[in-house]
Design a protein with these regions (language model features):
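Short alpha-helical scaffolding segments that buttress acidic/His motifs in well-ordered protein cores
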Residues: 146, 150, 255, 307-311, ...
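Polyanion-binding loop/helix "lid" in catalytic or ligand-binding cores
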Residues: 17-37, 286-322
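Intrinsically disordered, low-complexity regulatory segments
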Residues: 2, 10-11, 20-115, 123-144, ...
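Short, charged/polar, low-complexity loop and linker segments
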Residues: 120-130, 196-201, 309-315
Length: 987
């Protein structure tokens, strides 16, 4: 074990403050607690606070004796106490939490049981509220007392999950098995139905449909298990009651079925001779043969199921092993790129050179430790609901002696602000299918208002409408809540913009109607609330000297690693298996790759419900070859004689005419080789293709071949040089079977050559498509719509047509009719930068990083993304987060050498006489200097002359003032107990 000993007073003080657990209860990554009860602690808290739990006075005293400040006076002899009463003795006074089935009032647990959401490291849990109101020391005590009390209760009561808890009753077992068998039969039906559709269905759609169907089976069976498991079952207590360990998925895999195994986000592929395993027939697509495990862990897997399950598990283990190194390297690159960023005394974020990277940290200037999630209900309410909930009625206006004009203006302003935030939320993330109503604010308004909420309280009716509005404006403009140090007109506007969400929160939680009639507040109480909000905001503003760059690097680096490590816990869950695709994409974005692997364009229509137009645009962009339309292809050698044979009859019966010649030779008798190609009518109609298109594209294809003949490889050149002429004929689009004849005259031939020619015509002739676009997909995505007049959310979600193209070709997209040119979305950051500029590129960076992390289940505050993207774009060019990007940041030689290629940087610095000003974090650490951040961002100056001329005075009224001397470290004294060791360095 290693020991770390502070070598100076400053070092010991920083260790004492920074490394102290009570100061690390909330994490900056997502502003949520990172310390809380886990596993047995959560289970014990749940069991102790159940409604039917009671303990006698002796047990109560035993449990309370484990707490730091036991309140024994509350316990009377020979009396029973509920678990809620016992636990309430350790909740600090003044803590309030009111949720649907849970209520704590002034430190008393009145309703509900504790679980993971209330006692663990979760947002707006009791731990979060205690920390927010009472601080770190009281929170540390509360967590310690909780752990001691609930674990000792578990010792008294006993709790274990055993083999007997794995069994379910016969009726539930039959219900689960019936669901599985029914779904497997449905799966056979779906396969038959799709196979009958033949070429009209996309193979990927076919696979995705089958996979989604089987994934839903797992969720349904797990729900049956959850609904029918007895409440006393220890699995139920641990997983569904306390939510301490495991999920419905884990319990379901033990008792019902393991479910569909996923490899690389897809069903198990038929890799060996058209089979997944040797146990199954050729080209078998049924659920059981493609990775569905119908058995559960209790009854054990069949042989082939075990193989499938191993495939899913192996993928997770390999990903974990291979990607851990790359994710660790990502975090190191982030740390080295961001380590110099700090908040300065004018509120800006600057690097070691003093260059401004951000005018306001994270776009809101708030310390990430101090933010809290608040629900803003107005986001989802209609105009009428807002008027009803936040505007006063005529009787209330009369009762409170308030002006109707003032009330109308307040409601109107609230509706306008809500509308603006709705639009900005959807546009910023290009997500129109969901609306979020919970936001991080610098003040926990819900907690503060809960402390003062008491509808039964009697109070003087002295709180006026206009006074509430004045105080809301005062909170927003008071110097305690300033975000910018120097104020000017444009900064006033910026400050107002940065506080928009906070303004909406204040207008909702401090609305005059709620304050006067719901909270029943008087003027004195309201003033206390205003002061609480001001002081909470002041604490929340980020402090000068804060090293926000390193905080951002760790907040983004840790989720990147976690995205990858979580995989092994979900072997068999499709959604988690595909999440690992996020790590390569994150590397791609941070490295500013010029050629990304999967360039994508999202196209939206002007008329969002025009499905016909969406289909047309998709068909235009989709790459379509002759091979995609073929129902049959044959090769004939026909000499064009008049003999009455079967071949002549067959070719004449096709009724082909209207010849398109390949070159100037137009004698059809010279072209004996016939490629007879039958096309599928339904596919042609679906893809909007006619025979004229096919013939034209074949002739143009041959023309391009002839033009490129000189630059061709020898083998391909010999193939096409053999053609001396040809003609393309077709019947009519109205014919029963659309047919094409390609007749060729060859100088010499062999059969492999004939086959190659036919394959080339089938696979290389593109009938539709756009250069640079390898494919496209037409889908309908949910779009939430709000009524312009009423502001209400539509009861049924609307769907808009979205075309996703695999590739980018802006010139072609610009001329597409019906496409909304203002809503095109490209995922290639470099392309956006070159075309639209640095601000557009910054926006894409934020959106792409957010989407990638969200897909992997990683959660962190938006502010961290803003810091990273601002660093990548503050120079006006895109700075990559790697060794190439550091050169654009104008770092000094020592700082550059601390990252990579150390000797190269030192040699260059020596050859070109470069100077290091020792301002960067790495440079100062190398030279033993204090870094220019935190307590090193300022210096203390002492007037020694005043000190020399001063004298000590006794205060005859207060007594002599005692000064504490320097404290020696007890640990050092024990180690160096012989007294001969030089300990001067301690002081």
């Amino acid at each position: 074990m290693n020991g770390f000993f502070g070598q100076s007073i400053q070092a010991r003080t920083e260790l004492d403050l920074i490394a102290n657990v009570k100061n690390q209860i909330v994490g900056a990554k997502d502003s949520n607690p990172i310390i809380g009860c886990v596993q047995d602690g959560v289970t014990g808290a749940y069991l102790l606070t159940l409604d039917d739990v009671s303990v006698d006075s002796e047990e109560a005293l035993y449990l309370m004796s484990r707490s730091e400040n036991p309140k024994f006076e509350k316990i009377k002899k020979n009396k029973k106490y509920s678990g809620k009463e016992i636990f309430s003795t350790i909740i600090p006074e003044g803590i309030n939490s009111m949720k649907k089935n849970f209520e704590v009032k002034n430190g008393e647990l009145l309703k509900g049981s504790l679980n993971k959401s209330t006692i663990a490291s979760k947002k707006n849990s009791l731990i979060h509220y205690v920390y927010d109101k009472k601080g770190g020391l009281e929170t540390r005590r509360f967590v310690d007392d909780t752990q001691r009390m609930v674990l000792n209760y578990l010792i008294l009561r006993g709790f274990t999950v055993g083999f007997g808890d794995c069994f379910i009753d016969k009726d539930t077992f039959k219900k689960v098995k019936k669901q599985i068998n029914d779904k497997l039969l449905d799966n056979y039906f779906e396969i038959s139905n799709m196979e009958n559709q033949g070429s009209t269905i996309n193979p990927e759609t076919y696979e995705d449909t089958l996979q989604a169907s089987l994934n839903s089976l797992g969720a349904n069976t797990y729900k049956v298990i959850q609904d029918n498991l007895e409440k006393t079952n220890n699995f139920h207590v641990m997983t569904f009651g306390a939510q301490a360990k495991g999920k419905g998925l884990n319990i379901g895999q033990i008792m019902s079925c393991i479910g569909a195994v996923s490899v690389e986000g897809k069903r198990v592929k038929k890799k060996v001779n058209g089979r997944t395993l040797a146990h199954f027939p050729y080209n078998e697509d049924s659920a059981l043969s493609r990775g569905f495990v119908a058995s559960n862990f209790l009854e054990g897997m069949k042989g082939y199921e075990y193989f499938f399950h191993s495939m899913g598990g192996r993928e997770g283990l390999i990903d974990t092993a291979l990607k851990t190194s790359s994710t660790g390297y990502i975090q190191r690159k982030l740390v080295k790129a961001l380590e110099d960023l700090r908040v300065t005394y004018d509120g800006t974020v600057r690097n070691s050179n003093g260059t401004i990277v951000e005018f306001l940290y994270g776009d809101n200037g708030i310390d990430q430790l101090m933010q809290s999630e608040n629900k803003l209900s107005t986001i989802v309410l209609s105009n009428k609901d807002i008027e009803e909930h936040y505007g006063m009625s005529k009787s209330e206006l009369k009762s409170s002696k308030s002006k109707e004009s003032m009330n109308s203006k307040y409601v109107k302003d609230l509706i306008e602000l809500r509308k603006e935030i709705r639009e900005k939320q959807m546009d910023s993330m290009q997500n129109y299918g969901t609306i979020e109503s919970s936001f991080l604010l610098p003040v926990n308004l819900y907690r503060i208002m809960s402390d003062y909420t008491d509808s039964k309280r009697k109070s003087k009716n002295d709180l006026k409408y206009e006074y509430v509005l004045e105080k809301i404006e005062e909170i927003l403009t008071d110097n305690k809540t300033d975000l910018y140090s120097k104020r000017s007109k444009f900064q006033d506007k910026d400050e107002s913009h940065s506080k928009k969400l906070f303004r909406l929160g204040l207008m909702e939680y401090l609305s005059p109607k709620k304050c006067v009639f719901d909270y029943n507040l008087n003027k004195k109480d309201f003033d206390e609330i205003v002061e609480d909000i001001k002081s909470a905001f002041l604490k929340a503003v980020v402090q000068p000297g804060e090293m926000v760059g390193v905080i951002t690097a760790q907040s983004l680096g840790e989720p990147t690693t976690q995205m990858n490590l979580n995989t092994k816990h979900f072997a068999g869950a499709a959604s988690k298996s595909s999440a690992n695709m996020g790590v390569p994409r994150i590397e791609e974005i941070l490295s500013n790759s010029k050629n990304i692997k999967t360039p994508m364009t999202s196209l939206f229509l002007k008329e969002i419900n025009d499905g016909k137009l969406g289909k047309y645009v998709n068909n235009h962009l989709n790459t379509i070859k002759i091979n995609d339309l073929i129902s049959d292809a044959e090769i004939y050698y026909h000499l064009f004689d008049d003999k009455d044979n079967e071949l002549n009859k067959k070719l004449k019966s096709d009724g082909v005419d209207n010849p398109f010649y390949l070159n100037d030779k137009k004698d059809s008798s010279l072209f004996p080789w016939v490629f007879r190609i039958e096309l599928d009518r339904e596919t042609m109609l679906d893809k909007d293709i006619v025979l004229l298109d096919v013939k034209t594209k074949i002739v143009l294809f041959y023309y391009d071949i002839v033009q490129d003949m000189k630059s061709m490889k020898k083998e391909k050149k010999e193939l096409w040089e053999n053609i001396m002429g040809g003609v393309v004929l077709s019947n009519k689009d109205t014919s029963d079977t659309p047919t094409i004849h390609i007749r060729l005259g060859l100088n010499n031939f062999d059969y492999p050559m004939i086959i190659k020619l036919l394959k080339s015509f089938m696979n290389d002739v593109y009938l539709k498509g756009v250069k640079g676009i390898t494919g496209s997909d037409h889908s309908k995505e949910i779009r939430i719509l709000f009524d312009e007049k009423t502001g209400a959310m539509e009861s049924k979600p609307d769907y808009e047509n979205v075309i996703t193209a695999a590739g980018i070709n802006l010139n072609e997209f610009r001329v597409l009719k019906g496409v909304n040119q203002e809503r095109m979305y490209f995922n290639d950051v470099n392309f956006v930068y070159k075309t639209f500029g640095i601000e557009a590129a910054r926006s894409i960076l934020v959106t792409e990083l957010k989407r990638t992390f969200n897909a992997g289940g990683a959660g962190f505050n938006y502010n961290h993304l803003v810091v990273l993207t601002n660093l990548m774009t503050y120079t006006g060019d895109i700075v990559s987060i790697d060794r190439n990007g550091t050169s654009k940041m104008e770092l000094d030689p020592l700082a550059r050498a601390s990252f990579e290629k150390m000797m190269e940087h030192f040699v260059n610095a020596a050859v070109f006489n470069q100077k290091d000003r020792i301002k960067a974090t790495s440079s100062r650490i190398m030279t033993g200097r204090v870094i220019p951040g935190g307590t090193g961002s300022f210096e203390l100056m002492m007037d020694t002359e005043k000190l020399a001329n001063s004298e000590f005075l006794d205060d005859e009224y207060q007594g002599r003032t005692q000064f504490e001397g320097f404290r020696d470290n007890a640990l050092f004294e024990d180690i160096m107990g012989d007294g001969e060791v030089n300990v001067d360095f301690l002081t």
